[in-house]
Regions:
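Extracellular/secretory-pathway and virion-surface proteins
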Residues: 165-557
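Hydrophobic h-region of N-terminal signal peptides that target proteins for export
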Residues: 1-8
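Extended soluble regions of mature proteins
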Residues: 10-185
């Protein structure tokens, strides 16, 4: 880090200009100050991450920021700033007869009143300086936000400084803007260009050899898993987003994908999804439907919880790998697909470590290339002494068969049965809701992928939610689907409407409020009007349900 460079105090006087702030002509409890010394205007506090200066000697604005142990500097010449328009009126402020000019910037109007007679020079906003001899005494944004100078004083106890020297890295305006944004939050890389493919020769690691921050491949290569630490940035975040990048490494088809979390084992008698990845499907409890079909690990039971699905996504038809194999004039294929969704309520930040995984169902040797990061955004409005309530996260069911390549059954029970889960709440929960994700599958004309089907949810026998999940916007994502088939009517397969998903998109959950649910034992039921199978072609539904909320003491049985 470059050391701060202090400006000498014994040669040049320092002047402070103080401004009151108003909103809609009402004074608010906030003020602004700028400092002027030796033709330099200091616009920021010494403690601010980004520093801003107006250099009147060299006719430039300078902004600096410390990021990743480096100092970056942006230099903006005065002649590239917004130009002003002279207005007719004048007014007296602090005894100075002030001229009026206006600026137009990004569809905003900024009115400025300034004097050239004051010893101090400058403006509280470096974009709006009428000339280098001006001191702005009043600034009005769009007629309703106002800064008005209330005093100009000489100060003796202020030490202006600049936090750069010749070693600072000069970047352009767009690069500096990127650095500012990146400095405001923390990116936690989870997976980096990992291949998810079908590889039956993958060796399953031994449980006693598993370590934190190492990537493991399971279920014949179709799942990547990693145990990560819940960092202070995650624990203290205001919002957490999962950002997934995906591109084809040889697979041409749209595939089911899921990003999910599984707990680390705390007790020997607790079964987790990791047990099945390590030792096989027999480790998972079995759900048996009315026709004796067996489904492995799909509901919460004593000693077992299904995974917490944080992203439900679908790969596009062959983006990246097939771009040059399916060239069409005026079709500029995407290089990759980026999925990003807020997952704050689903990340167990009161844990020290969790397993996080990505599943893509495919039998292709090339498969797909994925990267995943968690973006943690710090809290801006947290009051001093305020304590965060603990998150309540209780996964109830998931028919997403992340071990499809290990012969885990598809979620096709809804044709002849209702999915029923018993659970118990032992605490008072604030803002309790069920996050319900649902997508229908069966890829022929009469299959549930292409036929709207009713979904209903009942809690303790009372209907709390119903919807026909359906997406009609799939044509929006045509340029992410180079390998999609083109039909004689001009449509592409990726254009077709589907049961709540499109090739190359996320399927966000529905938020179902359950605030009336009290402590005690309950039962939740999911009813889907699943259509009949045709020969070997089967319908199924990928659904997941997680209870979320806030509480002081988590104790769910």
């Amino acid at each position: 880090m470059f050391p701060f460079v202090l400006i000498a105090q014994n040669k040049f006087d320092v002047y402070k200009v103080s401004y009151d702030q108003y909103e809609n002509e009402k004074k608010i409890n906030r003020s602004t100050e700028i400092f002027f010394q030796n033709q330099i205007v200091f616009l920021t506090k010494n403690s601010d991450k980004m520093q801003q200066y107006i250099d009147l000697k060299n006719n430039v604005n300078i902004s600096t920021i410390a990021f990743e142990d480096k100092i970056f500097k942006k230099i903006i010449p005065f002649d590239s700033l917004p130009s002003s328009k002279k207005e007719d009126d004048t007014r007296v402020i602090l005894g100075y007869n002030c001229e009026h000019v206006s600026f137009s910037y990004f569809s905003n109007r900024i009115d400025i009143w300034y004097t050239e007679k004051a010893i101090a020079k400058g403006t509280p906003n470096s974009n709006y300086l009428p000339n280098k001899n001006a001191l702005v005494l009043k600034m009005v944004y769009n007629g309703n936000q106002t800064l008005v100078a209330n005093a100009i004083t000489k100060v003796k106890n202020y030490q202006p400084f600049v936090n750069y020297n010749d070693g600072a890295i000069v970047v352009d305006k767009s690069e500096f803007e990127e650095i500012i944004i990146n400095s405001r939050y923390k990116k936690l890389a989870i997976f980096d260009n990992e291949i998810i493919n079908f590889d039956p020769n993958r060796t399953i690691p031994k449980e006693n050899e598993l370590v934190t921050d190492k990537v493991y491949h399971f279920s014949n290569g179709s799942v990547v898993l990693k145990k990560i630490k819940i960092t202070p940035e995650l624990k203290n975040s205001q919002a957490i987003f999962a950002k997934l990048t995906c591109k084809s490494n040889g697979d041409a088809y749209d595939r089911t994908g899921s990003v999910f979390i599984a707990p680390t084992k705390k007790k020997d008698d607790i079964t987790t999804l990791l047990d099945a990845y390590l030792y096989g499907l027999d480790r998972l409890p079995i759900y048996i439907d009315n026709k004796e079909n067996k489904y492995q690990g799909i509901i919460k039971e004593e000693g077992y919880s299904p995974a917490i699905e944080i992203l439900s996504f679908f790969t596009p038809f062959g983006v990246n790998y097939f771009n040059n194999k399916r060239k069409i004039n005026n079709y500029n294929w995407a290089k990759e697909v980026i999925y990003k969704e807020e997952v704050s309520s689903l990340i167990p930040t009161d844990e020290d470590e969790v397993w996080i995984g990505i599943f893509i169902g495919n039998y292709d040797a090339g498969g797909h290339i994925v990267s995943l990061e968690l973006d943690a955004y710090p809290s801006m409005d947290k009051k001093e002494g305020e304590v965060d309530r603990k998150k309540y996260i209780a996964p109830l069911f998931s028919t997403v068969n992340t071990m499809e390549m290990s012969e885990q059954n598809y979620g096709g029970l809804f044709a002849n049965d209702t999915l029923k889960v018993n659970f118990e709440i032992k605490e008072d929960i604030q803002n309790l809701q069920l996050l319900y994700t649902t997508t229908g599958h069966g890829g022929w004309d009469n299959g549930d992928e292409f036929v709207p089907r009713m979904n209903k949810i009942f809690v303790d026998g009372e209907e709390v939610f119903k919807i026909i999940p359906w997406r009609t916007d799939c044509a929006t994502y045509r340029l992410s689907n180079p390998a999609s088939g083109n039909f004689y009517d001009g449509l592409s397969s990726s254009d077709l409407s589907r049961s709540n998903w499109c090739p190359g998109t996320l399927t966000p959950p529905y938020s179902i409020p359950l605030s009336k649910l009290q402590k005690g034992k309950h039962v939740i039921e999911v009813v889907i009007e699943q259509g009949p199978n045709e020969g070997s072609s089967t319908n199924h539904w990928n659904i997941s349900g997680v209870l979320v909320g806030q509480l002081n003491n988590l104790n769910l049985k």
